[in-house]
Amino acid sequence: MDTDILQKQDAEVFASIANETKRQTETLELIASENFTSRAVMQACGSVMTNKYAEGYPGKRYYGGCEFVDVAENLARDRAKKLFGCEYVNVQPHSGSSANMAVLFSVLKPGDKIMGLDLSHGGHLTHGSSVNFSGQMFEAHSYGVDRETGCIDMNKVEEMAMQVRPKLIIGGASAYSQGFDFKAFRAIADKVGALLMADIAHPAGLIAAGLLPNPLQHCHFVTTTTHKTLRGPRGGMIMMGSDFENPLGITIKTKTGSRVKMMSEVMDAEVMPGIQGGPLMHIIAGKAVAFGEALQPAFKEYAAQVMKNASTMASRFMELGYTIVSGGTKNHLMLLDLRNKNVTGKEAENLLHEAGITVNKNMVPFDDKSPFVTSGIRIGTPAMTTRGMKEAESRRIAELIDQVITSASKPDISAICEAVREEIKTICHNNPIEGYSV
């Protein structure tokens, strides 16, 4: 993208972007929630669509001049429906958190009970954390993973649901490397009269590619981000497999009296004007482009390689003596428990940064360290796979990470990090990000 104008007008902002471009191209991105969008997606996000206010929905806006942004939003909606097989979709949420907020606000009242995976066990802030709206406006109860297996015990989930009787159960995670049994979750939800929401922000691309089970057939609501494994712009989305009458009994007047609103009507109104105003039409245009890319055969090949790389890397880590929470991975990420390496997550993150490898410190289940220190790191393969890296690189990267972590207390750690950084730079040079240049 031409940056000559920006460089001349605002050298400081230009420099920050240039430096970030260099960081992305010359270092290895292993944060599980990050990826590289295509230049086509970035071009749509940087287009004139950013100038247009479009409160409302296609064909029913509060502003004039929306005929062309309507085209973009309809393309995004139609492509998302085809990609995931949903009857309803709202592509306007600004983020995954916004999407989750819209669902919770549309079917719950303040003080209602919800259940979600504990944040310290791999859940997400919006699934009931006490520092988040979801744990402050609603009575949140958290289920966790088994101390021995590191996996969710559905029997314990059922026991908690029977005791708590929540109005909504949330299945989803930000640091859980196994799958969710949404059929079992739905059976539990039906038993206690709860609604079921799947948050697939992390594995959405793998689900779209048909590599992981689609939760739409079991869940009342499915939310996701549009970046991460979907490789689109930063944003959110809400889907329903099929529409149904809203459970709160909200009605709408008709010519002959009134009727109960469909859930799609309630959800649309909750997104706008409920929690948002004008949608980000340039981002929605970028979402449309990304969904179009995800519908191509090449995306399925990409998603399959993401999982192969994660599995290969996890296996190599275990060969090197690392503990992976839940014993391995069935998606795009893994959570390394570093307690047997005598290194904290914070220390590992900082040392790996010096070595040109970006990961994030992460709490492990039953962690005795704070979220600012942690006992683990989270590693994901979406971004490295976008660069074209495969199993050979996955194995070597695990070995390089091991070199750094096992040398943490050595006096020559700086030299070791520098040597690893040079090899990482070579690996990245041999696997460039298509269309990116410093």
From Swiss-Prot:
Signal peptide residue numbers: none
List where in the cell it is found: Cytoplasm
Major localization listed first in the record, in broad terms: cytoplasm
UniProt KW keywords: Amino-acid biosynthesis, Cytoplasm, One-carbon metabolism, Pyridoxal phosphate, Transferase
Q: Which residues cross the membrane?
A: none
Pathway as given in its UniProt record: One-carbon metabolism; tetrahydrofolate interconversion; Amino-acid biosynthesis; glycine biosynthesis; glycine from L-serine: step 1/1
**Might you give the EC number(s) for this enzyme?**
2.1.2.1
The protein's matches in Gene3D superfamilies, at most eight in alphabetical order, are given as: Aspartate Aminotransferase, domain 1, Type I PLP-dependent aspartate aminotransferase-like (Major domain)
Q: Which residues carry this modification: N6-(pyridoxal phosphate)lysine?
A: 228
Keyword Amino-acid biosynthesis listed: yes
A GO molecular function annotation here is:
pyridoxal phosphate binding
Q: Which Pfam families match?
A: SHMT (PF00464)
What superkingdom does the record give? Bacteria
Q: Which GO terms describe its cellular component?
A: cytosol
Q: What does this protein do?
A: Catalyzes the reversible interconversion of serine and glycine with tetrahydrofolate (THF) serving as the one-carbon carrier. This reaction serves as the major source of one-carbon groups required for the biosynthesis of purines, thymidylate, methionine, and other important biomolecules. Also exhibits THF-independent aldolase activity toward beta-hydroxyamino acids, producing glycine and aldehydes, via a retro-aldol mechanism.
What is known about its subunit structure? Homodimer.
What name does the UniProt record give this protein? Answer: Serine hydroxymethyltransferase
Annotated organism of origin? Chlorobium chlorochromatii (strain CaD3)
Lineage runs: Bacteria, Pseudomonadati, Chlorobiota, Chlorobiia, Chlorobiales
